[in-house]
């Protein structure tokens, strides 16, 4: 393939992708982790060495993703909280990834049509919208860039083992990818898969050179389990046979969504049991999975020359998606569309190979068939791009986003509660209240909705109802520090300072790093002229990263004997 054709292919891919994802540039933040990573993340708001150090020693939203968070810090320095800038950056990274994918599969397949097919469907597949249109999922498009780059560097090394610099480069890119998203831990196994594809013998050298990769993968796997440990309990609600069924369901889900990306949703919740049993589609999934396996085996037997590609593609898919197939359960969703960002490349490779086979055998030398084939390909690309373009609008803002989720999951209290939060953020308290009430109709014990109603009553000045709902929230979750803190605020507003201090202390007992409680109890002691005690609480708040008006702190400090 000459350079002009390569350039033309890349320009087509980038143009189609840019059009498909253009709506994301106009999108806002959504109230789903965007606050934790960007809006309320104080560490990105001052680009200092101290904050950079904290970024690399802190997990965000139960994940260790310092490189992704560092990219937000750079953006905040330049663009502040302009959401369009963050969305544009995500799209730029996705465009870069699409180009790298083309390059990678051009090296692997030595076929320009196959690499074009894989790249364009990677670029515009609707299942990948979540990775690009969601600001908080920057880690996906960023880790993929270094992950794929590491693969290409390793392929260069395979061509000439004397070129150790490419092996070193592969390790460096792998490290950066790991610091961006722990899902990169699958790479060492993918390198063995590349060895297989290039028919390299598994000898001593091939194993030794991968030891650094495995050491890094093991370390970051342990780190991921530690930082995401709070998400593991969800799957413990199901028995071992049921979790096994989930494996088959996930495999079937991802396989069918490759060809039929319909009924997409930002969150796919775990199923509710009916009379103690999982829904029928889950029970059926092991049998469907078996049929898929039979199909793949049949193809590999019938088309021997493509057997290596089939094995490579299937193993690539399972190796790269293995960290989120939940052998070690993480997260609150049974499946997630963003998890397919890199894994789908393996399946795209298989499909592209068979499309090429069909083209060569039945289309290539027949003018009419060739025209029909190109027309069909254009229609598929256009319709896929349009589906992606439509899906991008779902991420317009929090209200539209959660309304789409509620449409797909009408019995989910979390959807109503989250849409209520979106209404709350723009000051539409009436709609927020209605959504919180709807959440409680579905689940009367929903902690978030109960707490949020308390907040609404507090804002409206209805302190009696606020106290009632706050106490109700505490009954539902006794270790809810924020609820105690909020109750302390209400007591302070109505002049019950001793009760307020008691509630703030209760909040601190449940969360020793709950900064607002330290600040508020410190302020109460300031009003009571107990400057020693006030200083201790305010100083602790500052040590934890809290912000206090400097005049207040200096006054308390000067009058305190503890300074």
Give the positions of each predicted feature.
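Polytopic membrane enzymes that build or remodel cell-surface glycoconjugates and lipids
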Residues: 1-431, 437-448, 452-455, 482, ...
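Structural marker of alpha-solenoid helical repeat scaffolds
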Residues: 408, 442, 476, 510, ...
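Boundary/linker segments of alpha-helical solenoid repeat arrays
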Residues: 414, 447-448, 481-482, 515-516, ...
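Register position in tetratricopeptide repeats
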Residues: 425, 459, 493-494, 527, ...
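Terminal, low-structured helical/coil segments at or just beyond the last alpha-helical repeat
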Residues: 533-563
